[in-house]
């Protein structure tokens, strides 16, 4: 079994005075978790494998602030950083990579213009491009867009529909088919968030995570729903995720990265020191 990664996710809101890490349920009811650079330093010191920064403001004005946050973080931490949120152009990707990001995650732009994935991976390399899939279960399995049926946590059959704009707009695209397309277009990794689970702390959506992992050969990062370190174990053992993303359980001090890794190691999951 390959070494599994633990990745704290920092959802950042940006203002004229800098950035603030926040966390909510399904991207609403946001609660402040602190300064992004300070949190990043803490996770670096605790042994996180990577960091993900998501600019949830995603405004033109905020982009310069995000670049400043990434530049300051890059001078303090020495683990790979992935940055996303509202990225629409090759120029934005270039600026963020120059600021110190190692990878870029794209979501809505990729759905609206799939060839953007190919263009970005051709220019920067597929290892730099992480495509995020936000999806939500849809129990209307007779929908003509329903290409793959997956069982939900409650046992009911459903297909998973890609959603964009932070989960506000359904697309009619089957998430498993979209994952295959993403891989074909050159994305190096998938970051999968089930909106059914996001922010609930009831655990990752294991069924769709496992189904997408089985449909593609590129790594899949499980995201959305971590409430305990046992949920991370489930993501690795049951869903066979390559990495587990978590936010609030780390931000608010419920667990440290070290505690998560010790627990996983004791249960036979290979993790880095």
From Swiss-Prot:
Catalysis performed (reactions) = 5-[(5-phospho-1-deoxy-D-ribulos-1-ylimino)methylamino]-1-(5-phospho-beta-D-ribosyl)imidazole-4-carboxamide + L-glutamine = D-erythro-1-(imidazol-4-yl)glycerol 3-phosphate + 5-amino-1-(5-phospho-beta-D-ribosyl)imidazole-4-carboxamide + L-glutamate + H(+)
Q: Name one Pfam family in it.
A: His_biosynth
What InterPro entries would the database entry show? Aldolase_TIM, His_biosynth, HisF, IGPS_HisA/HisF, RibuloseP-bd_barrel
User: Gene Ontology cellular component?
Assistant: cytoplasm
**EC number(s) per UniProt?**
4.3.2.10
This protein's superkingdom?
Answer: Archaea
Subcellular localization(s) per the UniProt record: Cytoplasm
Q: Name one GO molecular function term.
A: lyase activity
GO-annotated biological processes? L-histidine biosynthetic process
Q: Which UniProt keywords apply?
A: Amino-acid biosynthesis, Cytoplasm, Histidine biosynthesis, Lyase
Which CDD domains does UniProt cross-reference here? HisF
Q: In which pathway does it act?
A: Amino-acid biosynthesis; L-histidine biosynthesis; L-histidine from 5-phospho-alpha-D-ribose 1-diphosphate: step 5/9
Query: What does the record give as the active site?
Result: 11, 134
Task performed by this protein: IGPS catalyzes the conversion of PRFAR and glutamine to IGP, AICAR and glutamate. The HisF subunit catalyzes the cyclization activity that produces IGP and AICAR from PRFAR using the ammonia provided by the HisH subunit.
Q: Which family does it belong to?
A: Belongs to the HisA/HisF family.
What does the annotation say about its assembly with partners? Heterodimer of HisH and HisF.
Q: What is this protein called?
A: Imidazole glycerol phosphate synthase subunit HisF
Query: What species is given as this protein's source?
Result: Methanocella arvoryzae (strain DSM 22066 / NBRC 105507 / MRE50)
* Upper classification of the organism: Archaea, Methanobacteriati, Methanobacteriota, Stenosarchaea group, Methanomicrobia
